[in-house]
C-alpha cells in the first residue's frame, strides 16, 4: 500500500474551515437574537420561545410580518400629513432592522450550506468542494503551508497495481 497526495486544481487561498463556520454561525445567531430584541423594543411583537433554535422558516415569517407592518405604516403615513410624524421614524427604524435581518438570514443560509458541504471533513476549497486542505511534500518554502489536495492510495502486488482509491482525508 502506497499513498501520495495529489494537488487539486483549486485556488490555494480559497479555504473554508469548519471551526470558523461554527464560530461565525454562533455570532450570527446572537446578532439575530439582538436584532429581534431591538424589534421588540420598537413595539413589534416577535417573541421566540426560550431555548428555540433559529431556523430560516422562522426568520422568513418574521420578515414577512415586518414587511406587512411596513406596508400598513406607509399607508398610514400617506393619509396623515403631520410635520413631525412619529410613524416616519418608526418606519425608518423598522426598515433598517428588516434590512439587517435579511442580511443575517443570507449568512445563516450560507453557513447551513457550508456545513452540508463539509461532511466528515474539517475543511474544503471554495473552488473545488471535494478537495481537502493538506500538507504536501512540494512545499518550496518549508513553512508547512496547506494546499487543496486529494489522498491517492495505491495497492500493489509484485509491482502490479491491484487497486487504487482517491480519498479526501489525509
Enumerate the predicted regions with their spans.
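Polybasic low-complexity intrinsically disordered regions
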Residues: 1-170
Amino acid at each position: 500500500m502506497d499513498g501520495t497526495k495529489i494537488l487539486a486544481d483549486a485556488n490555494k487561498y480559497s479555504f473554508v474551515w469548519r471551526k470558523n463556520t461554527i464560530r461565525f454561525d454562533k455570532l450570527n445567531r446572537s446578532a439575530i437574537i439582538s436584532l429581534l430584541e431591538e424589534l421588540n423594543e420598537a413595539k413589534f411583537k416577535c417573541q421566540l420561545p426560550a431555548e428555540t433554535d433559529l431556523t430560516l422558516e422562522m426568520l422568513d415569517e418574521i420578515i414577512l410580518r415586518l414587511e406587512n407592518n411596513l406596508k400598513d405604516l406607509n399607508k398610514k403615513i400617506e393619509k396623515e400629513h403631520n410635520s413631525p410624524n412619529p410613524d416616519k421614524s418608526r418606519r425608518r427604524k423598522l426598515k433598517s432592522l428588516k434590512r439587517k435581518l435579511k442580511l443575517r438570514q443570507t449568512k445563516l443560509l450560507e453557513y447551513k450550506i457550508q456545513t452540508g458541504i463539509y461532511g466528515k471533513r474539517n475543511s474544503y476549497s471554495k473552488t473545488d468542494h471535494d478537495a481537502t486542505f493538506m500538507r504536501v511534500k512540494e512545499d518550496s518554502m518549508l513553512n508547512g503551508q496547506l494546499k487543496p489536495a486529494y489522498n491517492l492510495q495505491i495497492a500493489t502486488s509484485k509491482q502490479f497495481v491491484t487497486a487504487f482509491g482517491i480519498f479526501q482525508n489525509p
